[in-house]
Amino acid sequence: SVVPLIPADFPYPVVLVQHMPKGFTGSLAARLNELSPLRVKEACDGEPLRPGTLYIAMGGKQCQLIQKRPGEYYISEKDAEARGGLKPCADIFYESLVNTSLDKIYSIVLTGMGSDATKGIQLLKQTKKVEVVAQDRESCVVYGMPRAAALAGIVDEMVPLTEITKTMLKRIGV
């Protein structure tokens, strides 16, 4: 409902942090790559980010974004500790964006237990322009993560799952 609707000519890289254990994100990436016009792959440590590619954070590792030079961003996948029992953890990924020169960041918060993503986005919003679209309560299997983000006041728009991609593409101007 989200990834397959992103067009093949999408001009930016996309990073998906999905709470999945080691060994499952590779098959998820392969399946989404079959269903999507966008290139989808499991993120690899040291890999440069490329426009038109969606990188799925590797299960069982912590994913961060590293900037080597202005405009050059790389994935870092490390065997760091779990945070809140999560590996990968969206908060850790968002926190890594603070130290980059990215000036505008778009985020989607989908169904999930707990409050992962909220603290990271709050921190990011202190120094960057961040737009957040979250899945609405009615279309969530578990309303935890979108609810936490909404209660923290960091969500710009809440929409049904079927409208997430269209809404974000409109916000980005694609």
Residue map of PLM features:
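Conserved acid/base catalytic micro-environments in cytosolic active-site loops
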Residues: 1-174
